[in-house]
Regions:
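A broad, low-specificity signal for short, low-complexity segments enriched in glycine/proline
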Residues: 3, 7-10, 18-19, 42-46, ...
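Glycine-rich flavin
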Residues: 47-48, 52-145
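Intrinsic disorder at enzyme termini
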Residues: 1-37
């Protein structure tokens, strides 16, 4: 009589464990797994970078803060700062992969990518993770717009 072990749920690897632990193909993420929704938000971010940031990159690199402020506002209008923030707070309500796709596209925008990353990761993420409900309702819609 042969017994087989019941399948176990994949565990979450921490830190650099992925370097040391075996992994299955199912645990890997490749661009082929992107959905149409992921591609659409990625295209939106890519067009924003190509059409609105790269043409004025020299001005941004010369610290034209008013221009940077306008571009941050435009990115907010496009929903790029609130990709994975729930709609109830003014976000788009997509998943973390969508947020990753946007961040990847924004990385091609030189120093504006740092501006984008700081706004998204130093203000919005901590507020989502640690803010009270009242703080989220008060601040997130303004930060995302």
């Amino acid at each position: 009589m042969s017994t087989t072990a019941a399948p176990t749920a994949p565990s979450t690897l921490r830190g650099g464990e992925w370097l040391l632990q075996p992994s299955s193909r199912d645990s890997l993420f490749t661009p082929e797994k992107l959905t149409d929704e992921h591609r659409l938000i990625g295209r939106t971010a890519q067009e924003f970078v190509q059409n609105e940031i790269l043409p004025v990159l020299d001005k941004l690199e010369q610290k034209d803060w008013e221009l940077a402020r306008r571009l941050v506002q435009r990115g907010g209008d496009l929903g790029l700062f609130g990709v994975d923030v729930p709609e109830a707070y003014g976000g788009v309500g997509l998943d973390k992969v969508s947020s990753l796709v946007v961040s990847e596209k924004m990385a091609g925008s030189a120093s504006f990518g740092a501006t984008f990353g700081a706004h998204a990761n130093l203000t919005i993420v901590p507020l989502m993770l640690f803010g009270s409900e009242a703080q989220k309702q008060k601040y997130l819609p303004k930060l995302l717009a």
